Amino acid sequence: MEGFAKPSTSSGSGVTVRASVAAASIEERFADLCKAKLGLDESTTRQAMQLLKETNNILKSSMSSLGGGSPEEIERFWSACVLYCVSRLSKAGRSKEDGSVSLCQILRASKLNIVDFFKEMPQFCIKVAHILTGLYGSDWEKRLELKELQANVVHLSLLSSYYKRAYQELFLSNDGKSSDNSSESNNQEASDYYRFGWLLFLVLRIQTFSRFKDLVTSTNELVSVLAVLIIHVPVRLRNFDIKDSSYFGKKSDRGVSLIASLCEKHHTSEDELSKALEKTNTLIMDILKKKPCPATSACQQDNLSFIDPEGLTVFKDLLQGDSLKPSLIILEKEYENAINTKGELDERMFANDEDSLLGSGSLSGGAINLPGTKRKYDVMASPAKSISSPNPMSPPRFCLSPKGNGFCNSKMAPSTPVSTAMTTAKWLRNTVSPLPSRPSGELLRFFSACDKDLTDDIAHRAGIILGAIFTSSSFGERICTSMRSASRMDAIWTEQRKMEALKLYYRVLESMCRAESQILSGNNLTSLLSNERFHRCMIACSAELVLATHKTVTMMFPAVLEKTGITAFDLSKVIEGFVRHEDTLPRELKRHLNSLEERLLESMAWEKGSSMYNSLIVARPALSVEISRLGLLAEPMPSLDAIAAHHNISLGGLPPLPFQKQERLQDKDEVRSPKRACTERRNVLVDSNSLRSPVKDIIKPKLPPLQSAFASPTRPNPAAGGETCAETGIGVFFSKISKLAAIRIRSLCERLQLPQQVLERVYSLVQQILSQQTGLFFNRHIDQIILCSIYGVAKISQLELSFKEIIFGYRKQPQCKPQVFRSVYVHWPPRSRNGKTGEDHVDIITFYNEVFIPAVKSLLVEVGPGASASPKKKEEEKGPADVGPFPESPRLARFPNLPDMSPKKVSATHNVYVSPLRSSKMDTLLSPSSKSYYACVGESTYAFQSPSKDLKAINNRLNSVSGGKKVSGRLNFDVVSDLVVASSLGSDRDAKPAADPAKTTPVKCEPSDS
């Protein structure tokens, strides 16, 4: 379990002294890291030391939940996280001239890799959030830009892999496979050309975009670099025959059409590639000082043989002879000047497979949803690795070795995230861009058929909301360059994306109005088309699809919600309709919307500030007290005038909308978007209809019309038998929660090989909790309830299943996030038995014992193996939609029952004994019938990796030095707490025979992993 176990010594003063020595040692090592290895100035070092000291107690309690390795490794993680926060949040850290350091420097000095850093940094932020708020203000998370930096790393890793595959397909490399007769000098020459292309792309990327580093535009720039290489790299290094290569399929009478062929190969447009190539040529002239050859000259004739020169610019001696080395030096200097000003990452490392910073694993992790085929690095479950570098501050090396890591894979896949993004962008370019930027004639007729012509109001609103989303301030505060060309590109980019979102909004709105008019048998859609929240949701959904298509780094979901003033729960009401009414929507964008809806259902709709609570207090008045006590209600939705003023948007002389003030009075469901990430999904949620639900009274088989979905929660719904719109909406929402829970329960239970009846009991328990103990979902993740339900049902079913095993299975689930079981929200009542009060975050076992079991113990009894429902109750639970239980699952593979015995020596070289868990204070606190519900105090949520890695972790704990003193008295197997082991070692002969754990023991004891 998370946290340090209590020491077994009886000397309190001795413990204090050792803790002080350990803290002093950590501070000494941290000071050496700041001054000797990183060369920080006094001001930055002082701020870093302050943050380290204030978080020291949290570090001690996080030894089992951060990094997963030795205490020394966890300390290095913590130090790196502290330094990154200080470098980004402190005033001195905003400029490199003021003594700040980049993330790359921090990681090299700490001997960590970037993948492991991004795995652990979110945990650090959760644990020290209140301290960071006190030191740096409430907006520290936005200023930290952690998600944006992670997205940028993911994009660069994908682009580097894409570039590597394309280069190796076109040119000889230094891997020894393309040319058996190539000499060492030729290999180095090939590597230099590869390096030139990547550096040219990086400089172009910095010069062109100050903020909007989206994946699609970056890919266009990368393809333009390939075009430059094709016509300038010496012919002897080509890996293709220009006349016969299938790579160049577009030909004319004058030869191969290079631009058209590259567009066909890389799914871009000739117009976009021509513009990108023009910018690349301009950069070569401005920075490398190369002059283009006249069209009639004879330069580069060998390279242009059988190539149509139209639209191409050739530079004399750009990559010939002795000109390559000087060009590399100039590009290196240009790039270094840029990253030394504001850069966090030395992006040159992505062209080097062997760079120690890259590591292995996935950086997507749910926060960044990149479409495409299954990636090699989908799951990060391995313990963090210590990465050494011979010279931490040395520049990265470049290589073309096919030996890839998590970032580079030399095997050309049929579909990659980059190629998928380019294909999706093609849909936007071919289907949406040609549409008019004004409503069609049919849509105008719907607007004019309302009680009042709403044409001007709708156009007015769209201008303000899209202006709020697509502004320079929306895409971060940091600018990589002050070049005017970058600012011009920003303005062009935002205007293009804004127009695409506007056209998509009008297109889908027309289709929705057509369908709604058929449902209502009339064209008067005043109730829907005058609803402020509905239009904002539609605009937000359109903008999100445009941003998701281009894979922007800085405007990832849920940024559009905050800009539009809505919540994720609001947006979920239009997601299904949006997908249904846009037939041409690509599969990847449908998946994106589905994933957003799933993220909403699993956690974001339950967060503080969700408009769901405003409907829930109407549908379930009994919950209003708890909702108010926790402060969960949403804030009012900001007016259009407020949004326009906040983003400095001109209103264009249009008068304020007449219905805005009325909306504030009528719609009590208005909210401002929560600041934390939130998201949604739908497709998979409608596929599971085979489950009996004890809450069928709140689940409706059909979705209501949009008018009722966006009506005031207290308004009666005429199509639902007199119930309020809130009851209808909550019923639909709960039905989706039930289906999502069913899918995840089935998946996890089958992975754990649990029996069929256990699977159904778990589902029944979750349904009962949703119906009768809804408050357990408040501010929590649905998976936290599922994990606890599985363990509780396993306990009452007398199964040999530990929380550790459940977490190990959960780690393999595609939606797994470590925060789910490491940090569970609790709000301690004034008289809690542990003495704590107020808000807190605990591990899942503490939540299970302290909150979950007291709330659901009676429900567990009802779903237990001895429970028997009356025939009448069974008949009530069986609805017309019932089509049977879960399909048969694999049977449980039971663990052997081990006899209880005296302490057993488990090591030949160490005096280490393991004894079965004995009675504790819980014996006196729990009745015999209640003991079987609780989780073992010493149980861990840390999943094992493999026998060898587990033994290595045990040895690290045995041999580790903490605070200068070797740990010799206690052994943490991560299964039983140190206190239990110590008490067991103190009494060797008092063991009792094993008994049925469901009847006599307060907790389930587990055999050691050793």
From Swiss-Prot:
Broad class of the protein's primary localization: nucleus
Gene Ontology cellular-component annotations: chromatin; nucleus; transcription regulator complex
Pocket: annotated segments: 416-858
Keywords linked to the UniProt accession: Cell cycle, Nucleus, Repressor, Transcription, Transcription regulation
Region annotation (Domain B) ranges: 728-858
InterPro entries attached to this UniProt entry: Cyclin-like_dom, Cyclin-like_sf, RB_A, RB_B, RB_fam, RB_N
Disulfide linkage: none
Region (Spacer): 617-727
Record GO biological process: cell differentiation; negative regulation of G1/S transition of mitotic cell cycle; regulation of transcription by RNA polymerase II
Location in the cell: Nucleus
Job description of the protein: Regulator of biological processes that recruits a histone deacetylase to control gene transcription. May play a role in the entry into mitosis, negatively regulating the cell proliferation. Formation of stable complexes with geminiviridae replication-associated proteins may create a cellular environment which favors viral DNA replication.
Name this protein carries in UniProt: Retinoblastoma-related protein 3
This protein's encoding gene: RBR3
